[in-house]
UniProtKB/Swiss-Prot annotation:
Protein name per the record: Phosphopentomutase
CC annotations in GO: cytosol
SUPFAM superfamilies membership: Alkaline phosphatase-like (SSF53649), DeoB insert domain-like (SSF143856)
Keywords annotated in UniProt: Acetylation, Cytoplasm, Isomerase, Manganese, Metal-binding
InterPro entries in the record: Alkaline_phosphatase_core_sf, DeoB, Metalloenzyme, Phosphopentomutase_DeoB_cap_sf
Gene: deoB
Keyword match Manganese: yes
Gene3D superfamilies, alphabetized: Alkaline Phosphatase, subunit A, Phosphopentomutase
Gene source species: Escherichia coli (strain K12)
Length: 407
């Protein structure tokens, strides 16, 4: 029986890539800088002491970081017995965004350039804004700028509630984000607006990767909170992913837990399970692993590392999240049968000690565990697509165009 379980710790980079200079990210190191802050006692808010990740370390995390950067992260045990196979992987795709990273993991790197809204103020073309106002019958709009999602709620949330004008904003990623209050604006109305925005961006040739619905609740600045009803409208991958091939060629099953289905625009997904927060995502993943049959992938994205702690530059929160993940990891490992493989990885970096609020161009960890997986180093991988090619070989689908099987 062939089953693979892929866990993406969204934004969990392990050191800057060789091309980081192109992105202004030389020296970025999500894991290394979190570990350093913890070792110095600078991340004791809600947790305490050196970064404690014994289970990830046994799967090769510290060694993968050493391969990427040349050193073991502060406070982590470089001499621990390694029971998994580990690697550090470079991104072949042109960007450092979520779709690019995920698609490349599934064997389809993004070799074209996404469109971006690069102006920090008045970010969106007037023609696009006018069409959105007209088609969605809006009283206007707010924002039209680059911003952190939580900052812009404090700045414009109250005005949005009074006027009914949606908040439009973007970032260094190829995204068009729309924040609206779940109660005063309405969730269905927000989703409809996002569908219109997706259509206009696609038809207008803007080449924008995602439209993201960012619903929130609360009644005044300071207590607005984003909810778990986020929805991403992505374009489809430019070629069949290994997920699609498993479904088409092997009549397999691909279970999305969290936002995976959104990222792949539902392509190659046979079941969607919604969950919000690390514990809920873990619980849902465990349930699906227990029920998984032959030729099945269970694919989970743990988004909080990126959205709650990476972008918000919350070192202590990120560290606490990693430690929670590590504590629960044995629950996943204990469910593996003879031929199963568990892959822990990431899609990009988001160093919470870095300047700004955006992603960082970093190597990702590739930690592979299973009863028949030979422990040890799988070395430096030139593309995340090596994961997809490995899965193609494992399930016996046709080869992917990019990547080399790791074993």
């Amino acid at each position: 029986m062939k089953r693979a379980f892929i866990m993406v710790l969204d934004s969990f980079g392990i050191g800057a890539t060789e091309d980081a200079e192109r992105f202004g990210d030389v020296g970025a190191d999500t894991l290394g800088h979190i570990a350093e802050a913890c070792a110095k006692g600078e991340a004791d808010n809600g947790r305490k002491g050196p970064l404690n990740l014994p289970n990830l370390t046994r799967l090769g995390l510290a060694k993968a970081h050493e391969g990427s950067t040349g050193f073991i992260p502060a406070g982590m045990d470089g001499n621990a017995e390694v029971i998994g196979a580990y690697a550090w992987a470079h991104e072949m795709s042109s960007g450092k965004d979520t779709p690019s990273g995920h698609w490349e993991i599934a064997g389809v790197p993004v070799l074209f350039e996404w469109g971006y809204f690069s102006d920090h103020e008045n970010s969106f073309p007037q023609e696009l804004l006018d069409k959105l106002v007209e088609r969605a019958n809006l009283p206007g709009y707010l924002g039209n700028c680059h911003s952190s999602g939580t900052v812009i709620l404090d700045q414009l949330g109250e005005e949005h509630m009074k006027t009914g004008k949606p908040i439009f904003y973007t970032s260094a990623d190829s995204v068009f984000q729309i924040a609206c209050h779940e109660e005063t604006f309405g969730l269905d109305k927000l989703y409809e607006l996002c569908e219109i925005a997706r259509e206009e961006l696609t038809n207008g040739g803007y080449n924008i990767g995602r439209v993201i619905a960012r619903p929130f609740i609360g009644d005044k600045a300071g207590n607005f909170q984003r909810t778990g009803n986020r929805h991403d409208l992505a374009v489809e991958p430019p070629a069949p992913t290994v997920l699609q091939k498993l479904v088409d060629e092997k009549h397999g099953q691909v279970v999305s837990v969290g936002k995976i289905a959104d990222i792949y625009a539902n392509c190659g997904i046979t079941k969607k399970v919604k969950a919000t927060g690390l514990d809920a995502l873990f619980d849902a993943t465990i349930k699906e692993m227990k029920e998984a049959g032959d030729n099945t992938i269970v694919f989970t994205n743990f988004v909080d590392f990126d959205s709650s702690w990476g972008h918000r530059r919350d070192v202590a929160g990120y560290a606490a999240g990693l430690e929670l993940f590590d504590r629960r990891l044995p629950e996943l490992m204990s469910l593996l049968r003879d031929d199963d493989i568990l892959i822990l990885t990431a899609d990009h970096g988001c160093d919470p000690t870095w300047t700004g609020t955006d992603h960082t161009r970093e190597h990702i960890p590739v930690l592979v565990y299973g009863p028949k997986v030979k422990p040890g180093s799988l070395g430096h991988r030139e593309t995340f697509a090596d994961i997809g090619q490995t899965l193609a070989k494992y399930f016996g689908t046709s080869d992917m165009e990019y990547g080399k099987a790791m074993f």
